């Protein structure tokens, strides 16, 4: 039986934290998130926070986006962003550098919903098939997205029809990700 998106995300998150601990002998550290409240924070010291992913008590659906654009969003999208709190995590997918976007706090969730709504409105104006971003790449014009119609994970060139399928499903994509720790 294939893994659920939630389980695949939890597995990747665990691999990321273990890779960080192996390299730095601590939980992951982030300097940019100092002063921003989150259930992920284990410790704040000097100008950095030590953090770890925290599963939500109950998965959520991002219905504000659906209501705002009057579009049902793919279940994998809800599962990906609704399962846990975490800082963004760096990884490689088949040699490509990616930064997996995550929700740090409920306030961060509101920001994501606004950004996603803007992204979907732009796609609607350009008459593009809707995609839902989940990661960024080294190229600011390319993002990793879920195709809202098929559920495939794609390399999506922003504002164009140029798309390349990377994985048949979100769970498959997450299982193939390799954590990258600086």
From Swiss-Prot:
Lineage of origin: Bacteria, Pseudomonadati, Pseudomonadota, Gammaproteobacteria, Vibrionales
GO cellular component: cytoplasmic side of plasma membrane
One Pfam family recorded for the sequence: Syd
Keyword Cell membrane among UniProt keywords: yes
Disulfide bonds: none
Protein known as: Protein Syd
InterPro entries: Syd, Syd_sf
Keyword annotations from UniProtKB, A to Z: Cell inner membrane, Cell membrane, Membrane
Topology term for the membrane: Peripheral membrane protein
Source superkingdom: Bacteria
Family in the record: Belongs to the Syd family.
Coiled-coil positions: none
Localization in the cell: Cell inner membrane
